[in-house]
Amino acid sequence: MHLHYKPNGCLFILQNAIDCARLTGQSIYTIEVFRPVRNIWNRAQEWARAAITPAGLGWMSKYIYQYHRLMLMNLSPREPATHNWPLYNYPPPHILVGYQKLLQICNDYIFDVRAYSRLKYSEQINFGSQLMNWSVMANCSYTINTGAYHRFIDMDNFSDTLTSIQQAILAEKIVADLALIRPMRGFGRTNLDADHDVPVEYLLQEQSKDIGACQERAWGLADRIRVQNAGRKDLVILTTIRKLKTAYFNFFLVKHLPLAPEQELSLPCDCFWLDAFIQKFAESDQAAEIDEALRLQQVPTQTLTKCIISALSLPNCAGTALRGGAFTLRPREGNRAVTESMRRARGEMIEQFVDRLPMRRRRRREVPQPQVAAEEYPSEPEELSFESEVRTAVAETIRLLEEELTVSARNQQFFNFAVNFYEVIQRLEALGDINETTLQRWVMYFFVAEHIATTLNYLNHQIRVSSPFGRYVMLNLAQVVMRARNEDGQIVYSRARNENGNTVLVTSCLALALTWLPQLREQGEEIRAGRDEQFMAEIAYHDNSGDVSEILKQVAVNDADIDSMEISFRFRVTGPVVFSGLREIQNINRRVIRAATLFRQERRPLPALNERVQLPPAQE
């Protein structure tokens, strides 16, 4: 069995019934009976003319077979869906490969509304190739409650407690980003016997749409979804990476906290110090004290943002040098600085650290042997070089761990927006422009950004990365529409971003949110004069994509008016149509077409599915 498809110029071959069954939701037996044929070049005479042209197939699909519904049923011979009109105990003459899987992908997510429209067919004819493709537009949306801030924003005497509220918000977000609170592992048993089913997973997903109901669970949504979908090996790696970032964050934060004096950690501990580093700053009682100090708002906001940006940007460059503490450096050993000893043993230490994790390594990387220089190393401040060495070692460890992740878990471009949000709040703090409006906006758009990133990551993995769906079904267009509404249900603003790829789309959407954050204003205040053209450039405004004055008016609306936000994800996909190579199915299809033609000529409605209809006799 060979199903040929050219989604992007390359020849793809579906070589077995298993892939076809997975993409159609049918059994292998059904596919074997169906005998799928993809390329009908020089074989077109085997099928009725109406069955092999886009117009004819569109008519049959809409009025006779109703493929938009039929493809979701069990089409195995003699199953209830195949009784009488129009199948007569056999599968249909066509199967839309990937259509059922697409609907399953959308159905398995937390969307409130799912709609599928514009099911169309197109033909590709080249020398030696005659193919038919289907395409459909999917529109899936859900609404998140952004107005229920509860303890996040809605507090009395806001102006008197602005600093404490800002620090509380930052502390809660940082706690979620670095998992300083041990997350609940699993949901336990999610359904009970008989009529007492309790949809726990559904209830938890619904709760994540309400920033007030989920409370502290509002933060860290993207990473929670990522961890929940990870396999055992990926879970070990992601947990270790999180511990490394947490330890690194606490290492720099500890000197700013009024904690009780603790015995300082002596390094380099024979230069194999990573395990002690994690135990000290991510797993010990001192880590819990740091967590409590964060909640008690004992750390300056600027320090918090610098530390979290440095930690979350790992393994990339931080951009800001930080000073840490809680380590006692040993004196120079053998006329060599301790940090130089750490640098020389870094590669071997990292390899041994990864090897000790409870997982099977994908490959063994050769440890480069550093060149030994005879001259004395220049005398530089040991504290600074030591802290640089700590970051370099942690960054290289995280980079090596990320290489061990599977492709889906390694795909992180959707989750890199947090650093940008922290940089915005850091910049506003430095300018002294923190007020109720900006804090409210920061919380809301961070919450919205996590939802957009999480959903786009899910769709990207299922539609573009997952095999075999990503090989045979092509994503043509992706669009995100954000509609903010007030308590009366009226639209406060509506913006759409559309691109030809999900990766670019998420960058575009988050850039839009980040651009709106610094627009400081009171309720009803317009964007400052001279800033309108700059703002339109920052949000990548395209000509004829909306009235400029209306967009500026929408931006000037106070975010306190926004009670909910509807997020719609629209995408168009194209997949292959396969024809049945079974002669009996082809003959039944010819008789069904003749019967439908007679019904139309007599101005009678076409029969309903499974209705008893006597077909015309077969023609010789």
Curated annotation (Swiss-Prot):
A motif (Nuclear localization signal) lies at residues 356-365. GO terms for molecular function: double-stranded DNA binding; single-stranded DNA binding. GO terms for biological process: DNA replication; viral DNA strand displacement replication. It holds the Pfam family Adeno_terminal. Its main location: host cell. The record marks 545 as: Priming of strand displacement replication by covalently linking the first nucleotide of the new DNA chain. It is found in: Host nucleus matrix. Coiled coil: none annotated. Preterminal protein is used to replicate viral genome, upon genomic encapsidation it is processed first into iTP and finally into TP by adenovirus protease. One of its GO terms (cellular component) is host cell nuclear matrix. Keywords: Covalent protein-DNA linkage, DNA replication, DNA-binding, Host nucleus, Phosphoprotein, Viral DNA replication. The modification O-(5'-phospho-DNA)-serine is found at residue 545. It comes from the Viruses. The record marks 187-188, 325-326 as: Cleavage. Heterodimer with the polymerase; this heterodimer binds to bp 9 to 18 of the genome. Interacts with host POU2F1; POU2F1 binds to the auxiliary sequences in the inverted terminal repeats and tethers the pTP-POL heterodimer to the origin DNA thereby participating in the assembly of the pre-initiation complex (POL-TP-DBP-NFIA-POU2F1). Belongs to the adenoviridae terminal protein family. This is Preterminal protein. It comes from Bovine adenovirus 2 (BAdV-2).
